[in-house]
Amino acid sequence: MKATSAAILVALSLALPVLALDPPPASSTASAKAQQTCGLGAAFHGGRRQELLGRVDEGLLLFRGLPETRAYLEFRQDKTFWYLTGIESPGATLLMDAASGRQVLFLPSPARNKEAWEGELWDSGDEWVGELTGFTEVRPASELLEVLEELTAKTRTIWISKHPHVAQAGCFDRAGPFDRRRAADPLDGRASREQALAEQLKERFGVEVKPIDGELFDMRRVKTAEEIDAMRRAGRAGAIAMVEAIRSTRAGIGEWDLDALMGWVHQREGGSGPAYHAIVGSGPNSLILHYSASSRRLEGGDMVLLDYGPELDHYTTDITRSWPVSGEFTPRMEELYDAVLAAQAAGIAAVRPGGTIADVERACARVLRERGLGKLIRHGSCHYIGLEDHDVGEYGEPLEP
């Protein structure tokens, strides 16, 4: 009891001087703006909005950013919302009118006490937001319904993304099935965030809600120069980390050691976190496609497979490599390694304008079958990358430069 009381007194003695301070003065416009960035720049994100508006003849386009996190985790924005705004702050909404070209950014009202805990947050009172983002109309989130009432009196269509919301380490091919399983659960049954939004819009405003995802996916599939640069930087960070992991491999260390090493190198090289969980499989664990435990010690006769990549400026990379723990290949290891390397080379050779992802898949599979390894093909050999590690895009669509 005495120890507990003493601990409380110490905590209070540390806290009281802070509590006695006057509220911190509001940051100046210059200093607040200096702490913020707008994704890949206002020109990039503004260009994405303009292109999307040019693909729609009429109606409103509504996109909601993610709310605050439920846990003590760093906030990460929904990929689609970030693509269109560059805003990495919770509680934001984007509304656009295809007919007039009007673009409105809605942000939460100022909450100074919250900023004392979490630092500068974007809100409707920040004078620098418009200059930084390119938005000429920034309004409080509390006015969203009022503006929707005004605009839906003139148009009866609202376009939204029904693509499952994903933030860091998220992919549509995981998020979509998760939402469907939860909706089908008889003891849960919750609709996805996107479905709930569609239902609310229909009920409140009597509008037709249409998906805009086809247009968004076409845009996201073909990368701009800014996106290619971000992906190259992510790839470089991932490659440096992979080389460090290979150099550090030896019998007796844990899979967790390579996991931690790569995560550290990713961040040292500018990454903001993992594009997906680390897959560090040694020995028998290397055969588990999405192994995540990282709990085994490496042994001298093992091959180790490492599949890990960072996210950098919201763009991902995906690198997989295998090597012997001892540093020397056995004849069988070399045979398998060479087969995979040959399949990879065939796949790269099949990548060309006008070709498809399906063509690349067939080229890789053909080599493996010729090497007698056809029965081991359990998954695809390639996929799009970009904002999501498994990025959007139809595999039958012709590839473009």
Spans of features found by a protein language model:
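Active-site neighborhoods and metal-handling regions in enzymes and metal-associated proteins
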Residues: A3-S5, V18-P401
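Bacterial N-terminal signal peptides
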Residues: A7-P17
